[in-house]
């Protein structure tokens, strides 16, 4: 598992992607709940 030199670790990609997805979904639902969903 340590042979990831020169490449981005898969767990790092998964973590970043998960945070981005959760953040975008959270912002979208928060905007919709606040009445700003139509502007997204």
From Swiss-Prot:
Membrane spanning stretches: 10-30
Bilayer topology: Single-pass membrane protein
GO biological-process terms attached to the record: photosynthesis
GO CC terms, sorted: chloroplast thylakoid membrane; photosystem II reaction center
Record localization: Plastid, Chloroplast thylakoid membrane
Signal sequence, renumbered to the chain: none
Keywords associated with the record: Chloroplast, Membrane, Photosynthesis, Photosystem II, Plastid, Reaction center, Thylakoid, Transmembrane, Transmembrane helix
Principal cellular location given in the protein's record: plastid
One Pfam family linked to the record: PsbJ
HAMAP family found in the cross-reference section: PSII_PsbJ (MF_01305)
Similarity comment: family membership: Belongs to the PsbJ family.
Subunit structure: PSII is composed of 1 copy each of membrane proteins PsbA, PsbB, PsbC, PsbD, PsbE, PsbF, PsbH, PsbI, PsbJ, PsbK, PsbL, PsbM, PsbT, PsbX, PsbY, PsbZ, Psb30/Ycf12, at least 3 peripheral proteins of the oxygen-evolving complex and a large number of cofactors. It forms dimeric complexes.
Protein name (database record): Photosystem II reaction center protein J
Annotated gene: psbJ
